């Protein structure tokens, strides 16, 4: 199985892919649904590690729909996998560190909301908002 680290950004994301043969493939792309689908749909199934952020949940769900195993890591525990090689912080280094942490299992998963809980939360939020009008 391949191991992928993704450093997500609102506009652009950096991807580091460690293949089964040990090759490192790096790619920078716009963080857009169609571009992510185009890149990941034909790739071998992979374990993908991304840090929790405002956009991590929709990216994780999209990649899971494509058949990949996605882990959203708790960024509060980033020193576990990212501090060793970080003299200057760059997206490329972060993606590489995430890919290596994915391969080694050196991360702490973040809590993820299920679809049902998300729908229930939105319904309750809308109800509370409507009650204030």
Language-model regions: role of each:
Residues 1-133:
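Phosphate- and other anionic-substrate recognition elements at nucleic-acid/protein interfaces
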């Amino acid at each position: 199985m391949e191991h992928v680290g993704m450093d997500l950004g609102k506009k652009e994301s950096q991807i580091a892919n460690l293949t089964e043969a040990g090759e490192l493939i790096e790619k920078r792309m716009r963080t857009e649904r169609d571009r992510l689908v185009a890149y990941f749909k034909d790739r071998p199934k992979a374990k993908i590690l991304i840090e929790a952020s405002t956009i991590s949940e929709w990216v994780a769900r999209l990649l899971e729909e494509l058949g990949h195993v996605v882990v959203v890591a708790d960024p509060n525990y980033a020193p576990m996998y990212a501090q060793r090689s970080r003299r200057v912080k760059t997206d490329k280094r972060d993606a590489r560190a995430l890919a290596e942490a994915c391969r080694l299992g050196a991360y702490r998963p973040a809590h993820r909301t299920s679809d049902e809980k998300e729908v229930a939360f939105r319904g309750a939020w809308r109800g509370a908002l409507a009650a204030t009008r």
